[in-house]
Amino acid sequence: MVDTMNMKRESEERQGLLERYNFPELIEDYLIELEIRNYSPNTIKTYKSIVKNFYEFLMNEDDLYDDRRVLRSFKRYIQYLKRDKKVTQNYIYLVTVVVKKFFEFSGIDCLEEVKAPKRTKSLPKSLNEDEVKSLINAVEVADDGSVIRRFIKTRDRLILSLLYSSGLRVSELVSLRINDIDPDERTIRIRGKGDKDRIVLFDENTRDLLMDYLKRRIHESEYLFLNRFGDPLTPRYVQMMIKNYARKAGIKKKVTPHILRHSFATHLLKNGVDIRAIQQLLGHSNLSTTQIYTSVDMQTLKNVYDRARLL
């Protein structure tokens, strides 16, 4: 009996990691757990991609018979991402954290000694106030075009105004429903990441654009932003739209929805808005995240420095 148990134990030890664990099933269980914990759909999608990519890498490894070999395979994977895929340091950090969390959830102890590398804290880019105005004014809304053309132009101008004046994420923008908006109070209820709702504001000009857009809509839908066929817009569509208007406005910088969001935060900070108020408007759970987004731009830094008159 003892010999049989020893033989069974030795047989299990000779099995590789992928034979001992059903990875596809573990991945599915992990994603269900993330959904139960109210992780956002985008976060779950990212985690799924990271874990599945690592699993596919492991399938080509043939020496996963103990923790040391599994650890070595993980390090080879990180090396592969850096050398061959040329990914950023921040992505390496994310991969390390996600894979470690997945292994911990699955009861696999191979990566306990792995430490996530430090993230880089590069300053996010932003547009200045004149560039934002040029971008929005690149959308020419005229009454001499077709009904569909006027609808599209009015919609596009409203999208640019909302992204900047409210600091929305593009995923939040395309998910907006008409009943989320209170034009009289100039507020929007955002269904944020992880089911964390928040209220954001918009200005008088954006309200006027909103009311004009609602009059010009040619399809009925609970969603605010629609294409010409009446379907909700996708994040990719909005990204390409902004890129086209930036080119038309002659802006040489890269312009994305996220850069408009950062410009919103940066300009509020420059105008004296308290950073905790900005944190609330952006929907950040940690103040440190807001501090990275709202790093003082170089021109403001120069102005403060010059006013100091050190010599």
Swiss-Prot record:
Protein name stated in the entry: Tyrosine recombinase XerA
Gene: xerA
Domain Tyr recombinase: 122-306
Any Pfam family matching the protein: Phage_integrase
Active site feature: 169, 193, 258, 261, 284, 293 (o-(3'-phospho-dna)-tyrosine intermediate)
Keyword hit for Secreted: no
Lineage: Archaea, Methanobacteriati, Methanobacteriota, Methanomada group, Methanobacteria
GO biological process: DNA transposition
Family that this chain belongs to: Belongs to the 'phage' integrase family. XerA subfamily.
UniProt cross-references to Gene3D superfamilies, sorted A to Z: 1.10.150.130, Intergrase catalytic core (1.10.443.10)
Signal sequence extent: none
Keyword terms: Cytoplasm, DNA integration, DNA recombination, DNA-binding
NCBIfam families: recomb_XerA_Arch
